[in-house]
Structures are given as structure tokens and as C-alpha cells.
Amino acid sequence: MDIKVVKGSITEVDADVIVNPANSRGLMGGGVAVVIKRLGGEEIEREAVEKAPIPVGSAVLTTAGKLKFKGVIHAPTMEEPAMPSSEEKVRKATRAALELADKECFKIVAIPGMGTGVGGVPKEVAARAMVEEIRKFEPKCLEKVILVDIDEEMVEAWEKVLGLR
């Protein structure tokens, strides 16, 4: 599977679906979620909350609202909003997002740094965990993962793990 690293906003990449590193309640009050909700609309959060609780290690698909994507995958990296995350939760969330994207037969999924914002997971740790999970994953439909973040350190961490630096 092709892995591409992009510095920029997840809302501007060319992908079929984007991933929101969520909390189990589906509330979109921090980090990447705020941007997705602000640009895509309240209906994204409403639908995520309706599908809650979303356990860490699972994921749900919602509308992308006004965004150009076919949907938003909410993959919790924490149970409650602003709760600390962990490497294991990052792994589980990444795997759950990939599984759902593949099950829905999306070709390209964009994933931001998982658990690195309010979750507090060090970027290098999250980058390694995410890339390892992506490399282990055996897709049926999914062809490409775009790792995208506005944070230069996150982008550098992915590039380092992927041997691009």
C-alpha cells in the first residue's frame, strides 16, 4: 500500500475519506476535530455522537458534511474528551480506521497524527506506531494512505520512520 506524507490541512488533501482521531463519545471539541467540524458542519459531530459510544479500537463512518470527502472516519484514541492517549490506543485507532476505510472500499484515506494533540502521545512514538500498523495492514480495496498534519514535527516524525529523512 502506498504511503504519502503531506504537510498541510487534512481538509485539503485529495482523499476519499478522512480520519478524525476521536473520543469515544463522538464529541468534536479539540484538535483536528474542531477544524473538521468548523469546515464540514455540525452534522458531522451530531452523527458521531448518535453512533457513540465508540470504543477505542473501533471506528464509525459519518457524513463529511460540506467537505468534499465521501465521509469522516471517527477512530477514538481516548475514551473521554481531552483524556491522555497512549501508543497502544494510537495503534488500535489507526488499525480501526484502516479496517473501516477498507471495508467501505475507499481507495485513499487521509490520517492525521493520532493521539498527539490533546492525547499527549509523543510524535515520534505515534509516527512509529501508525506506520507499523499501516505496513502490517493487508487491504482489499484501500490503495493509499496519506499521512497529513499541519505540525512540522509530526510530518518530520513520519518521514523519519519511513526513511524519507
From Swiss-Prot:
Entry coiled-coil feature ranges: none
Gene3D superfamilies found in the cross-reference section: Leucine Aminopeptidase, subunit E, domain 1
Every Macro domain range: 1-165
PROSITE patterns associated with the record: MACRO (PS51154)
Superkingdom of source: Bacteria
PANTHER family attached to this UniProt entry: GANGLIOSIDE INDUCED DIFFERENTIATION ASSOCIATED PROTEIN 2-RELATED (PTHR11106), MACRO DOMAIN-CONTAINING PROTEIN (PTHR11106:SF111)
Protein's name according to its UniProt entry: Uncharacterized protein aq_987
Native source organism of the sequence: Aquifex aeolicus (strain VF5)
